[in-house]
C-alpha cells in the first residue's frame, strides 16, 4: 500500500480563514499586552513556608497556574459586554480536551472560534520551551477533517518566579510573573519547526523551540499532509498503522 493510493477526504477551508486566524491571534495578543501594560501580570502564591517556594520544582505547578491566569484574564474581558475585542464567549476545557480554553469573537456578522492551547515556559530554566507536546497526532488530524476552519492557537507564556516577604504575615510569598508571550496558529507554523514524537498513543505533535517559531502559509489539506508525512517518517510507524488510524478516524472516503 502507498500513501498516494489512499482515497482521502480533502478538507477545504473558507477563503476568509487567513483573515479570521490573524484576527484571533491579534486580539489574543492585544488582550494580554494590555493586561501586562496595566501591571496585572503576576500570580501571588501565599504559603506558610518560612523559606518560600521550592523554586527548583516550581515548573511542576506553573502550567496549571498560568493557564488559570489566562482563563481569568479572558473571562474578565468577556464579562464586559461592550469590550473592544468583541470577545463574547470563554470556556475552560477539561484536562484531556484538545485545547485548554475556547475563545469566541464576534467579527462582523460571524462568530470566530479559537481553540487555545496554553503552554507555560520558564525564563529561569534554559531548555524550557524545547519540544513541548502540543497535541495528539490523530486528534488534531481529525479536527482538521471535521472542521476545515478549525483554528488551533498555541499561546506560549514565559514566566519567572521569585520570592518576596509578605509585610503583613512576615512569610515568603511566591511571585509568578509573566515575562513574555507569543501567539501562533498551528496550521501556519513552518515545516521545520514542527516535529513528531511517536510516544504516547498515536504520537505527539511538538514544536522544536516554542520561543523561536517561523511561519508558513498553507491550506488545511496541506497541513493534514504535513502531519501525515511527520507520522510516516518515524521509524516506529508504518503505512499499515497509518491506514488503520485513517480508517478509524474517518479520514478516508467511504
From Swiss-Prot:
Keywords: Endonuclease, Hydrolase, Nuclease, Restriction system. It catalyses: Endonucleolytic cleavage of DNA to give specific double-stranded fragments with terminal 5'-phosphates. The gene is hpaIR. This is Type II restriction enzyme HpaI. Its EC number is 3.1.21.4. One of its GO terms (biological process) is DNA restriction-modification system. One of its GO terms (molecular function) is type II site-specific deoxyribonuclease activity.
Amino acid at each position: 500500500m502507498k500513501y498516494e493510493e489512499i482515497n482521502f477526504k480533502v478538507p477545504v477551508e473558507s477563503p476568509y480563514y487567513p483573515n479570521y486566524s490573524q484576527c484571533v491571534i491579534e486580539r489574543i495578543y492585544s488582550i494580554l499586552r494590555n493586561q501586562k501594560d496595566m501591571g496585572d501580570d503576576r500570580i501571588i502564591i501565599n504559603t506558610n513556608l518560612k523559606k518560600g517556594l521550592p523554586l527548583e520544582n516550581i515548573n511542576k505547578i506553573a502550567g496549571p497556574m498560568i493557564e488559570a491566569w489566562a482563563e481569568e484574564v479572558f473571562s474578565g474581558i468577556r464579562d464586559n459586554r461592550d469590550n473592544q475585542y468583541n470577545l463574547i464567549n470563554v470556556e475552560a476545557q477539561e484536562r484531556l480536551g484538545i485545547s485548554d480554553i475556547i475563545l469566541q469573537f464576534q467579527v462582523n456578522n460571524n462568530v470566530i472560534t479559537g481553540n487555545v492551547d496554553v503552554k507555560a515556559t520558564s525564563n529561569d530554566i534554559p531548555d524550557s520551551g524545547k519540544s513541548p507536546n502540543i497535541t495528539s497526532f490523530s486528534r488534531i488530524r481529525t479536527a482538521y477533517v471535521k472542521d476545515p476552519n478549525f483554528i488551533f492557537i498555541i499561546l506560549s507564556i514565559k514566566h519567572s518566579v521569585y520570592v518576596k516577604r509578605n509585610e503583613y504575615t512576615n512569610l515568603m510569598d511566591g511571585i509568578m510573573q509573566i515575562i513574555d508571550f507569543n501567539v501562533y496558529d498551528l496550521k501556519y507554523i513552518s515545516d521545520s519547526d514542527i516535529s513528531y514524537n511517536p510516544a504516547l498513543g498515536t504520537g505527539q505533535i511538538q514544536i522544536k523551540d516554542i520561543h523561536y517559531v517561523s511561519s508558513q502559509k498553507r491550506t488545511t489539506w496541506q497541513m493534514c499532509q504535513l502531519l501525515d508525512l511527520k507520522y510516516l517518517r518515524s521509524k516506529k510507524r508504518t503505512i499499515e498503522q497509518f491506514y488503520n488510524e485513517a480508517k478509524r478516524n474517518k479520514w478516508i472516503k467511504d
